[in-house]
Amino acid sequence: MSANTENSTIALTADAGSDQNLIVEEFLGHAKADLDPAVIEKVQNGEQVEGVTAYARGNYYKISANPTSPDYIEPFDIHLHFQDGPTVLEGVNGATNEALLKVLIHRTKILDSQFPSEHNKQAIAA
């Protein structure tokens, strides 16, 4: 969890695949007070909890540099906000999986042109 003192709220987050170099968190919502881990688990399970503004699961993420990594150079944050609901009903309100995959494919093609690899070619073809 991380605090936002400006609005006096606490961001509720859960690990979504962190490793030694990167911290990958899913934003679950926010609350005005620190919550017990059992209450956070209820939010993760989709239960409504008084005093918590919950976000739809799988829509909000943050990737940041892990300052404890031996390879750490400088801080950065990447925020990902994915589409919440069908565009015909909700309008375009976030990135789609397809858009993110296009970015990854584009990057892999560039990397493969610089550092040819059979693994890159397999990833591009998949």
Per-region residue spans from a language model:
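Long, non-catalytic architectural segments outside compact domain cores
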Residues: 1-96
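Short, compact, well-ordered microdomains
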Residues: 102, 108-126
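Short acidic, glycine/tyrosine-flanked loop/strand segments centered on an H-E-D-like triad
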Residues: 80, 92-111
